[in-house]
Amino acid sequence: MDVNPTLLFLKVPVQNAISTTFPYTGDPPYSHGTGTGYTMDTVNRTHQYSEKGKWTTNTETGAPQLNPIDGPLPEDNEPSGYAQTDCVLEAMAFLEESHPGIFENSCLETMEIVQQTRVDKLTQGRQTYDWTLNRNQPAATALANTIEIFRSNGLTANESGRLIDFLKDVMESMDKEEMEITTHFQRKRRVRDNMTKKMVTQRTIGKKKQRLNKKSYLIRALTLNTMTKDAERGKLKRRAIATPGMQIRGFVYFVETLARSICEKLEQSGLPVGGNEKKAKLANVVRKMMTNSQDTELSFTITGDNTKWNENQNPRMFLAMITYITRNQPEWFRNVLSIAPIMFSNKMARLGKGYMFESKSMKLRTQIPAEMLANIDLKYFNELTKKKIDKIRPLLIDGTASLSPGMMMGMFNMLSTVLGVSILNLGQKRCTKTTYWWDGLQSSDDFALIVNAPNHEGIQAGVDRFYRTCKLVGINMSKKKSYINRTGTFEFTSFFYRYGFVANFSMELPSFGVSGINESADMSIGVTVIKNNMINNDLGPATAQMALQLFIKDYRYTYRCHRGDTQIQTRRSFELKKLWEQTRSKAGLLVSDGGPNLYNIRNLHIPEVCLKWELMDEDYQGRLCNPLNPFVSHKEIESVNNAVVMPAHGPAKSMEYDAVATTHSWIPKRNRSILNTSQRGILEDEQMYQKCCNLFEKFFPSSSYRRPVGISSMVEAMVSRARIDARIDFESGRIKKEEFAEIMKICSTIEELRRQK
């Protein structure tokens, strides 16, 4: 029987059909090669938008800088970055007037956080530009390197462990005439292999001391490294994103803390909340506009898009905002917060790896590093690249480009949201003093604008007024990419609104399936994704049940763990059949051991091991959950783990899932090839760092774990803790006298060794 597909939708309200419009199957595009071209595009575009500004030269670094602030008022619709200081301050003042005490309270909250934040806050985050090695590193390693070099240069305020004290060191480091750093380098030499008698290249890693003068150090401290943004769908061209170094990160963190605190108090802000909470907050604004548009009034909504948001924002404007927001606060606080925008006004963009050339005829490949672009002959490049390099040359110093205007992606999301909301806030009737008025939603560069007016002319006038007001603060609404609709239907941050936010379940499709971490985590993540979608995305019970069955099937094929009584032959089936036959209670076997699936949509919240524990044979329990099982590189797992899931649109989301440590929670071994490269030294540092932290947490289990306060070192803290624990255990009879004596002896030996060192 043929089914007419339109029949499927007869009973479905049209907004529910959105999941059928899903365009993103298959893998998203990833970038290969260097990001140098994309970074040059960003730098050149940013300068083009501000070209009528004033040029100055930075006295410390010699970098040419363009300042578009208070530049000419725009005469056309081209995007421009000429924000007017007095307009921004006016918008800030009005924001405060309509939300009494908002800045004051946020400053107090932030001040408290500033005084309590530990320097290890900076270990969060992924790749960070490491100024000591002049390339990207994991955040923890980059921080450790920075602190190590600060200390060897006599900057020791950071030893208190407070972030604010580390930032004092950063400030002092910028005044020093020179900084001595340790860098890694590698030597290659050809040697004969004893076994095979062939010639092989042997690499050795060395560390060498290097002195940076004030200018070179400042350039590195102000550098943002650039990479290409990966996995971006729906774009023909890739684009560059920035990773700042450790000197900038701490200051940015405090500014964003203040801005976040303000955003939380603004009903039009889509940050910092997410998910259902965000939907509820936004639905409120829409409801307000719809109830206030009386029968006589029209209400329209613009699904907005801004042209090159980051490249038209300006750090100098952010400095003005912060100066205003903190105007009644203590001097030290104002200084700390004003440093981030000042550093961004003087930032340098590192151009990345440079260009790769290959000659097909001679089979030669050579890399032109970014440092050489300043004076290489341009005849080797194509026309497009020639233009780029020509344009950027006046800005180059040591392979980095001076980039004073613009913000680079993802740096001040919260603060730029405050600026956006302050313009939405100017739409109140008492401010427009006309028949039209507006309100809306803002989340970083994304916005939705709701305009109410008695007639269509009024709506048009309101939109025009909003457009021009935005221009005055460097926000450029794109007339081509924004569209207007009767209020009740619009899109904002990939949420589609039609008489309420519509669940777009298809967006979550890419996160269904087997993640490929290990058997234990994958099972847990798989069922958690289904559970979360039932809660948040209108995934109905029948569909969920089907998703679950498909997931189990997928899982069994991935790990070749078909049921023990199946006919399917795989590499594992022989062992699994044997296990099946000798198991009394077959229902107790995990799916990954060839057992049956006991999940249904009612028990998705229970980890599989717990679900089947009572059904397991005793010896199976003993093998499965035995930390002493020698065949398992066993990893201790907190009761909750975090997985990264990829929705179709927007950033990768972190998702919590329950983790029960079993013999299936293995971790794959690291690739050996890294051990022969220049990364090896770093890898060893990282492992050392990891081991120390793990050891420390052994002594301070999370329940009693308070960060060590004061100046006692990690070792001293652990020794004193060991002594206290030993005494308690001895007095309660948990350990014998000999064991107690031995522990005390070890503690004394450690202290003795420290004194000698």
From Swiss-Prot:
Residues 286-483 form the RdRp catalytic domain. It catalyses: RNA(n) + a ribonucleoside 5'-triphosphate = RNA(n+1) + diphosphate. GO terms for biological process: DNA-templated transcription; symbiont-mediated suppression of host gene expression; symbiont-mediated suppression of host mRNA transcription via inhibition of RNA polymerase II activity; viral RNA genome replication; viral transcription. Its EC number is 2.7.7.48. GO terms for molecular function: nucleotide binding; RNA binding; RNA-directed RNA polymerase activity. It comes from the Viruses. Residues 249-256 are annotated as: Promoter-binding site. Phosphorylated by host PRKCA. It is found in: Host nucleus; Host cytoplasm. The keyword Nucleotidyltransferase applies. It is an enzyme of class 2 (transferase). It holds the Pfam family Flu_PB1. One of its GO terms (cellular component) is host cell cytoplasm. Residues 55-64 have a biased composition (Polar residues). A motif (Nuclear localization signal) lies at residues 187-195, 203-216. Residues 52-82 are annotated as: Disordered. Keywords: Eukaryotic host gene expression shutoff by virus, Eukaryotic host transcription shutoff by virus, Host cytoplasm, Host gene expression shutoff by virus, Host nucleus, Host-virus interaction, Inhibition of host RNA polymerase II by virus, Nucleotide-binding, Nucleotidyltransferase, Phosphoprotein, RNA-directed RNA polymerase, Transferase, Viral RNA replication, Viral transcription. InterPro entries: RNA-dir_pol_NSvirus (IPR007099), RNA_pol_PB1_influenza (IPR001407). Influenza RNA polymerase is composed of three subunits: PB1, PB2 and PA. Interacts (via N-terminus) with PA (via C-terminus). Interacts (via C-terminus) with PB2 (via N-terminus); this interaction is essential for transcription initiation. RNA-dependent RNA polymerase which is responsible for replication and transcription of virus RNA segments. The transcription of viral mRNAs occurs by a unique mechanism called cap-snatching. 5' methylated caps of cellular mRNAs are cleaved after 10-13 nucleotides by PA. In turn, these short capped RNAs are used as primers by PB1 for transcription of viral mRNAs. During virus replication, PB1 initiates RNA synthesis and copy vRNA into complementary RNA (cRNA) which in turn serves as a template for the production of more vRNAs. This is RNA-directed RNA polymerase catalytic subunit. It comes from Influenza A virus (strain A/Chicken/Hong Kong/YU22/2002 H5N1 genotype Z).
